Amino acid sequence: MDPRRNFQPGGYDSRNTFTSGSFGPPDFGESDEAELVSVSWNQDYSCFAAGTSHGFRIYNCEPFKETFRRELKDGGFKIVEMLFRSNILALVGGGPNSQYPSNKVLIWDDHQGRCISEFTFRSEIRAVKLRRDRIVVVLEHKIYVYNFMDLRLLHQIENMANPRGLCCLSHHMNTSVLACPGIRRGEVRVEHFGLNMVQIINAHDSNIACMTLTLDGLLLATASTKGTLIRIFNTMDGTRLQEVRRGVDRADIYSIALSPNVQWLAVSSDKGTVHIFSLRVRVIGEDAYSTEHETSSNSLQPLVSPASGANPGSSLSFLRGVLPKYFSSEWSFSQFHVPEVTQYFAAFGAQNTIAIIGLDGSFYRCNFDPVNGGEMTQLEHFHFLKQDSPR
């Protein structure tokens, strides 16, 4: 079942989509009662989008401020996907009393103030991912990949039930990598479109709960529904490079983030703690991976020693191989505590800082010590839906 699409480069058909007047001018007074439906980072974590019951809002992280908002009379959006800091967004209806269907993606050009294309499916859309040359639409059992310029369908990927809409993309233009759940429990499928190669990674025994890629797509970090371990893989050959432990009790992992310099990993969960781990891998790059696949086994290699602080291990790690694996685990290097009331999503900011956004409308910016670790220092905290948040 191919999705239907409507795209007219020279004109615009408003039937069943937005008209150019659907978004009224920003009205900061009447929409402060809007309910928050979703939050999502842009591709480089410099901004985030908030889908509300009355439209959407865009926020800049450093310095923190509301960039703009668009208000609707007909409800809001459960998915608001940005394309870096551009005027292009992907929108999917959802939330209280939304008049926009959950099976339709609207590509909105905010500069033109109109919808420039749409995709309609027969089932609910779980996620939409954008990169400068691709639009990726995630359904529960299938993923569609389109060319951005002409909306041509390029790939269809079957996967097992994916109610969370798990899918991540690389964002360097010299790599084209997509990771998603495979067709078996605990399996991740990695598509290297530029190399015409598929890598199947048996990441966990349980179902995949969360995943992320580095910007170049060479590293993959995953967590399962058990939520105790986070694993880092080489996407070229599927090698597991590192494993870190969030905790002992089961947890629902909300987000995993990798720092741009690939030195740090951040994890948030329903346990009310955001953890940062030190990574011990170095990236050579896809360029070292020739078309003959000559260097697939060493395109990513563990370092002998990390470039910064090391994760604490168990004091009984000298008994590795005798005691259970738990006793040789790497634990988090730095932590920050948030209320256990809602979902929080973490991302790395400027040097040694992380930003955290929550479905309660909270924004935190924190600093961590790259040498000594320990508790992070809170730098900022805003309730971004409130009238007194920076604009």
Swiss-Prot record:
Pfam families with a match to the protein in the record: PROPPIN (PF21032)
Keywords, ordered alphabetically: Autophagy, Membrane, Protein transport, Repeat, Transport, Vacuole, WD repeat
Induction of expression: Down-regulated during senescence.
WD repeat start-end pairs: 31-69, 74-118, 203-243, 248-287
Record-level GO BP terms: autophagy; protein transport
Residue ranges, annotated region (Disordered): 1-24
Primary site of residence: membrane
GO cellular component: phagophore assembly site membrane; vacuolar membrane
Tissue: Expressed in roots, stems, flowers and leaves.
Cellular localization per UniProt: Preautophagosomal structure membrane; Vacuole membrane
SMART domains assigned to the protein according to its UniProt record, in alphabetical order: WD40 (SM00320)
Membrane topology note: Peripheral membrane protein
Family: Belongs to the WD repeat PROPPIN family.
Summary of subunit composition and partner proteins: Component of the PI(3,5)P2 regulatory complex at least composed of ATG18, SAC/FIG4, FAB1 and VAC14.
Record note on domains: The first protein part may form a beta-propeller domain involved in specific binding to phosphatidylinositol 3,5-bisphosphate (PIP2), leading to the association of the protein to the membrane.
Function comment: The PI(3,5)P2 regulatory complex regulates both the synthesis and turnover of phosphatidylinositol 3,5-bisphosphate (PtdIns(3,5)P2). Required for autophagy.
Protein name (record): Autophagy-related protein 18d
UniProt lineage: Eukaryota, Viridiplantae, Streptophyta, Embryophyta, Tracheophyta
